């Protein structure tokens, strides 16, 4: 972080602070209206169990939910002496509310500062926060094997990213991030520090669109393993590998100005090999997300987008009952509206 700040200050040295502050701020207000058909990511077996024991659903009566999300973002561009060099500061905050699930109400946001020195040349630092994200009700084995308790976690992530061109309209992007994922008091045995690295190659085709291929590798260290209560005697560390393939077509189709799809496949392998923990021992899963989207500018400053996501997780385990318990299907669909504004006090 200190190194990044030194770089930014060095390029601002030749400008007065009044010149530095003269650029306008672009604000965007967003509203999302969506539907989730399996909020708690329940397997078929768990849905059958929930019909007899609704405490699994955390007090609600449905598997699905309508949700709304409000967002506010701001972008400030600072042009430096060299026309190809600039600094961008971007911040965004989201407030989400699942109507049928009172526990799934949370806020998230992030701040990015980036230095650009030409086409596809960028150095960026990001700080992200996800606050009190509700997963579902689980058993707290340190207290009771019969009662369920609300389980939520909070993410704090820092990421350093750099991109550079390879040749005309072809560029590479790499990043490294550090995420602290800490759970509420009843489930601290799952607290983890996660290191993730990514490498993405992107190609933009003239009068067509953009396609990318990204590889992601992460290691989650269960920092509370062996510390504290009995439940921490089991190691919940894991490794995961992802492949991500997004494609966008910007020449218009089906009434949209741009359409696209993305395919993301995640492979996760738990570290634990302990017969006393059949739920995690030797367990791995393959999760696939397939998105289809389209967007259209209704007015110069008003944009609407539509997205549908199909999600599937297949779990592999030494135990058939674990495979069935931890596999699920899910469908998301949402419509977003964004209204852009320009604030220029000068």
Predicted regions and their residues:
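Transmembrane beta-strands of outer-membrane beta-barrel pores
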Residues: 31-37, 76-78, 93-99, 127-135, ...
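Repeated loop/turn-to-beta-strand initiation elements of outer-membrane beta-barrel proteins
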Residues: 79-87, 118-125, 166-174, 206-213, ...
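Outer-membrane beta-barrel "beta-signal"
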Residues: 327-346
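Outer-membrane beta-barrel initiation region
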Residues: 15-88
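Outer-membrane beta-barrel translocator domains and adjoining extracellular loop/strand segments
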Residues: 39-46, 99-108, 126-128, 134-144, ...
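Detector for outer-membrane/organellar transmembrane beta-barrel domains
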Residues: 161-181, 192-273
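Residues on the lipid-exposed face of transmembrane beta-strands in outer-membrane beta-barrel proteins
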Residues: 27, 31-33, 68-78, 111-117, ...
């Amino acid at each position: 972080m200190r190194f990044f700040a030194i770089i930014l200050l060095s390029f601002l040295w030749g400008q007065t602070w009044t010149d530095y502050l003269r650029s306008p701020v672009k604000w965007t207000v967003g509203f999302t209206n969506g539907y989730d058909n399996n909020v708690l990511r329940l397997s078929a077996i768990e849905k059958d169990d929930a019909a007899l024991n609704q405490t699994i659903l955390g007090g609600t009566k449905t598997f699905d939910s309508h949700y709304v999300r409000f967002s506010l973002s701001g972008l400030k561009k600072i042009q430096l002496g060299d026309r190809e060099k600039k600094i961008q500061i971007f911040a965004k905050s989201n407030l989400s509310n699942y109507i049928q699930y009172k526990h799934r109400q949370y806020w998230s946001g992030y701040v990015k500062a980036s230095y650009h020195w030409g086409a596809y040349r960028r150095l960026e630092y990001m700080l992200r926060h996800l606050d009190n994200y509700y997963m579902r009700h689980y058993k707290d084995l340190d207290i009771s094997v019969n009662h369920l308790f609300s389980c939520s976690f909070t993410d704090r992530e820092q990421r350093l990213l750099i991109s550079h061109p390879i040749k005309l309209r072809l560029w590479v992007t790499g990043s490294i991030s550090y995420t602290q994922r800490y759970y509420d008091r009843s489930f601290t045995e799952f607290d983890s520090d996660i290191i993730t690295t990514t490498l993405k190659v992107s190609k933009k085709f003239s009068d067509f669109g953009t396609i990318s291929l990204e590889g992601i590798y992460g290691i989650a260290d269960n920092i509370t393993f062996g510390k504290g209560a009995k439940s921490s005697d089991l190691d919940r560390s894991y490794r995961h590998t992802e492949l991500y393939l997004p494609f966008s077509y910007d020449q218009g189709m089906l009434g949209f100005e741009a359409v696209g799809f993305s395919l993301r496949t995640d492979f996760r392998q738990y570290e634990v090999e302990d017969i006393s923990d059949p739920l995690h021992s030797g367990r791995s899963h393959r999760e696939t997300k397939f998105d289809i989207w389209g967007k259209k500018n209704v007015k110069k400053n008003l944009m609407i987008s539509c997205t549908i996501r199909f999600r599937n997780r297949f779990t592999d385990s030494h135990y058939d009952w674990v495979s069935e318990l931890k596999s699920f299907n899910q469908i998301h669909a949402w419509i977003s509206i964004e209204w852009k504004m320009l604030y220029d006090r000068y």
